[in-house]
Amino acid sequence: MSDLQKLQRFSTCDISDGLLNVYNIPTGGYFPNLTAISPPQNSSIVGTAYTVLFAPIDDPRPAVNYIDSVPPNSILVLALEPHLQSQFHPFIKITQAMYGGLMSTRAQYLKSNGTVVFGRIRDVDEHRTLNHPVFAYGVGSCAPKAVVKAVGTNVQLKILTSDGVTQTICPGDYIAGDNNGIVRIPVQETDISKLVTYIEKSIEVDLLVSEDIKNGIPAKQAQNDRRSVLKKYI
């Protein structure tokens, strides 16, 4: 079973718990304020980050065709240059949509597992008809060609979040998404086998905690009693 197949069994909450408790990542890898505009069907999505950077239309770098090079089992991740991002709602400084239905059509044909846009998207019904998972900050109707262009693929993306912290997404990072949102697993900083083992044990423990609570044991007591075993997996 591949890393992606192992991780797809878990919710983003499970993964965040692992990143927080095993690797002391305070955010649990979570990116706030993204909405599942075209939600995943029945399960989590997991894939390898294929990153795309957008810059102002007058940027000297030439535009790149990113959509015809989407790798299989990837999550397409689009973001703006940091100076076009905002800490505050709506989290970006342009009103145009960066991504549309034809892009999802092509990405799905190339066997991408989903798309994350740190900006606006359009053609909502098309994404949903395709059952192609798409997460974004919001929606719009206008194409982006008058204001921004894609200038780089497989580059680091810097994401300004609403707590004022800048998070990084690297090409090849694992991206997971479900109805709770989007989580990044930093591949270069984590032992995936160790992370998966912790998550599996944590899920087992929480099932026991749930049963204890249903049988009348106080929640705090059940958590303390059951979760002590997890220390050996950290």
From Swiss-Prot:
Competitively inhibited by oxalate, a pyruvate enolate analog. Substrate binds at residues 100-103, 122. Keywords: Acetylation, Lyase, Metal-binding. It catalyses: 4-hydroxy-4-methyl-2-oxoglutarate = 2 pyruvate; oxaloacetate + H(+) = pyruvate + CO2. The modification N-acetylserine is found at residue 2. A divalent metal cation binds at residue 123. Its cofactor is Ni(2+); Co(2+); Zn(2+). One of its GO terms (biological process) is 3,4-dihydroxybenzoate catabolic process. It comes from the Eukaryota. Disulfide bonds: none annotated. Divalent metal cation. Has preference for nickel ions for the HMG aldolase activity. Has preference for cobalt and zinc ions for the OAA decarboxylase activity. One of its GO terms (molecular function) is metal ion binding. Signal peptide: none annotated. Catalyzes the aldol cleavage of 4-hydroxy-4-methyl-2-oxoglutarate (HMG) into 2 molecules of pyruvate. Also contains a secondary oxaloacetate (OAA) decarboxylase activity due to the common pyruvate enolate transition state formed following C-C bond cleavage in the retro-aldol and decarboxylation reactions. Present with 846 molecules/cell in log phase SD medium. Belongs to the class II aldolase/RraA-like family. Homotrimer. Forms a ring-like structure with a central cavity. This is 4-hydroxy-4-methyl-2-oxoglutarate aldolase. It comes from Saccharomyces cerevisiae (strain ATCC 204508 / S288c).
